[in-house]
Amino acid sequence: MAIHLYKTSTPSTRNGAVDSQVKSNTRNNLIYGQHRCGKGRNSRGIITARHRGGGHKRLYRKIDFRRNEKYIYGRIVTIEYDPNRNAYICLIHYGDGEKRYILHPRGAIIGDTIISGTEVPIKMGNALPLTDMPLGTAIHNIEITLGRGGQLARAAGAVAKLIAKEGKSATLKLPSGEVRLISKNCSATVGQVGNAGVNQKSLGRAGSKCWLGKRPVVRGVVMNPVDHPHGGGEGRAPIGRKKPATPWGYPALGRRSRKRNKYSDNLILRRRSK
């Protein structure tokens, strides 16, 4: 991804650093409208997810996470911007006439060919079971349950690594640093997700963030005591606690929130480090 800097004619262009976005040229049979209900509210209209609301209307692009078009070569026709995710998507034309969207692998260009199935070449963009991959392969769009489609390592720049295979399981190191076991029969896509430099992007102004459906975030230390545990005091005061807390008084910033005795605890060999 190329970061584009504007001429500093206004404060917003001085602080902004955006990517050179690919034009969107979506197909009508692969997109459909979605009802973004609530804007962070539940069925009673109460805010359950803060800092959400507004934003530009979006059309959902149907992404092929299963990659079940087996043993048929497909050609990358377009690389497009998707408003529903940080990663780019690319339109694939298969030899049997099928057309689908997939996540854009980093380094893939228009005209490249991909294929999915067992014992296919270890090439960027190809999808195959973990049992057919050599150790050390960089992968993304990884299945957790066979046939359900990729669920892990799908964000922009995400990449996991196959580090071991033993018995019926394969050991993966995920982007978060977590090391876990997954069935060797599950499929994954070779390579890294594209648009890896998305974290270098700076919106530059509040209005650009509003377009994304993100509302302003107010610090608890500048609120009143009735609104936040960190609030109150004369002037600039500390939070008045040993440890930071959420607006509802629960421990924040470091407290482990994973549910205890979860079924997948036995599959996690090392907890995530991020």
Swiss-Prot record:
Q: Does the keyword Ribosomal protein apply?
A: yes
By its UniProt entry, which Pfam families does this protein fall under? Answer: Ribosomal_L2 (PF00181), Ribosomal_L2_C (PF03947)
SMART domains noted in UniProt: Ribosomal_L2, Ribosomal_L2_C
Keyword Chloroplast carried by entry: yes
User: Which BP terms does GO give this entry?
Assistant: mitochondrial translation
Superkingdom assignment: Eukaryota
First-listed, main subcellular location of the protein, grouped into a coarse class: plastid
Where are the coiled-coil regions? none
Q: Name one GO cellular component term.
A: mitochondrial large ribosomal subunit
Q: Where is this region: Disordered?
A: 1-21, 224-274
The record lists the membrane-crossing segments as none
Alphabetically list the UniProt keywords: Chloroplast, Plastid, Ribonucleoprotein, Ribosomal protein
Subunit details? Part of the 50S ribosomal subunit.
Record-linked PANTHER family: LARGE RIBOSOMAL SUBUNIT PROTEIN UL2M, RIBOSOMAL PROTEIN L2
Q: Which family does it belong to?
A: Belongs to the universal ribosomal protein uL2 family.
What is the protein named?
Large ribosomal subunit protein uL2cz/uL2cy
Name the source organism: Populus trichocarpa (Western balsam poplar)
Taxonomic lineage = Eukaryota, Viridiplantae, Streptophyta, Embryophyta, Tracheophyta
